[in-house]
């Protein structure tokens, strides 16, 4: 079905999924696609460290591509320090420097396999609470992010990582009031301090951390104004309507949309989703 939709589209489509391994396995959890679920990054590391992680990534990419998917919303490059932390089981659990090394090699491997990677969750979850169920506030100083959380993202950016997903954590050292996904300053840090020129996307705007902060459709408008190129939402209809309305009312400058579209098209070209003949200038 995805192949049919891809062939019917004038401009190639991005089809993405979360296939991290462990607790987040949107595809391999179904027996029709794989006999067993992909194991968590930490389980794979214990089996064979980095070589095993890269081989596991290749298997994931092969499976996803076989059913028409071209983006995996992975890897999780957060650096929690406590095994009790919400994000710990989804992370490598190996500290900032090792996570940075793994991230670099994994991004390169996914690119070689023509699978779009998405590093997450910028600016770093740390040991914070689950934003699926409420607002998480990070009180750590900015210097901590510079010496720990940012390292894997920097490593992945240097390796050519095409996408970064931004969390809904409120990080007080960057923005005291807004979730990171809706914060202009957090996006400024990503663009200017980390020199990232690729695609920036939100975590799901239907998550409770956002819903308890701002009304449904308004979240998407704030996300665009903050600097996101792509928006993820399991409740996308009202989000889309509010964005269109904001453009019509001049709340969102068309230039913002155009810049995002150019980045998305550039990535699609780089990953063979479209070729330049498909684009009318």
Q: Which residues does each PLM region occupy?
A:
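Second-shell residues forming the walls of enzyme active-site clefts
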Residues: 1-7, 94, 98-245, 253-256, ...
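Glycine-rich, aromatic-flanked loop segments that form ligand/cofactor-binding clefts
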Residues: 2-36, 56-79, 99-124
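Glycine-rich, flexible loop/turn motifs
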Residues: 23, 29, 34, 40, ...
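A charged helix-plus-loop insertion that forms the helical arch/lid used to bind
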Residues: 32-47, 93
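A short small-residue
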Residues: 37-43, 82-89, 130-136, 242-246
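Glycine-rich anion/phosphate-binding loops
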Residues: 45-61, 97-101, 143-147
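Flexible hinge/switch segments at interdomain interfaces of large molecular machines
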Residues: 76-81, 122-127, 274-281
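Mid-to-C-terminal alpha-helical segments outside catalytic/metal-binding sites
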Residues: 248-276
């Amino acid at each position: 079905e995805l192949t049919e939709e891809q062939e019917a589209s004038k401009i190639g489509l991005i089809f993405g999924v979360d296939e991290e391994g462990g607790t987040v396995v949107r595809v391999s959890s179904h027996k029709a696609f794989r006999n067993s679920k992909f194991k968590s990054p930490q389980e794979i590391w214990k089996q064979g460290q980095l070589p095993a992680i890269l081989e596991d990534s290749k298997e994931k990419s092969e499976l996803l591509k076989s059913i028409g998917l071209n983006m995996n919303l992975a890897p999780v490059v957060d650096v929690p320090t406590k095994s009790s932390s919400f994000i710990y089981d989804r992370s490598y659990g190996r500290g900032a420097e090792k996570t940075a090394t793994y991230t670099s090699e994994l991004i390169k491997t996914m690119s070689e396999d023509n699978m779009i990677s998405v590093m997450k969750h910028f600016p770093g979850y740390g040991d914070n609470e689950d934003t699926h169920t409420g607002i998480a506030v990070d009180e750590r100083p900015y210097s901590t992010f510079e010496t720990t959380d940012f390292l894997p993202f920097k490593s992945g950016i240097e390796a050519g990582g095409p996408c970064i997903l931004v969390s809904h954590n409120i990080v007080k050292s960057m923005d005291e009031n807004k979730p990171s996904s809706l914060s202009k300053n957090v996006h400024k840090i990503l663009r200017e301090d980390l020199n990232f020129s690729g695609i920036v996307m939100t975590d799901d705007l239907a998550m409770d951390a956002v819903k308890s902060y701002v009304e449904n459709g308004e979240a998407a408008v704030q996300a665009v104004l903050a600097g996101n190129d792509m928006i993820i939402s399991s409740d996308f209809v009202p989000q889309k309507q509010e964005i269109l309305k904001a453009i019509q009312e001049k709340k969102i400058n068309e230039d913002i949309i155009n810049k995002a579209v150019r980045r998305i098209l550039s990535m699609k070209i780089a990953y063979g989703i479209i070729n330049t003949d498909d684009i009318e200038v």
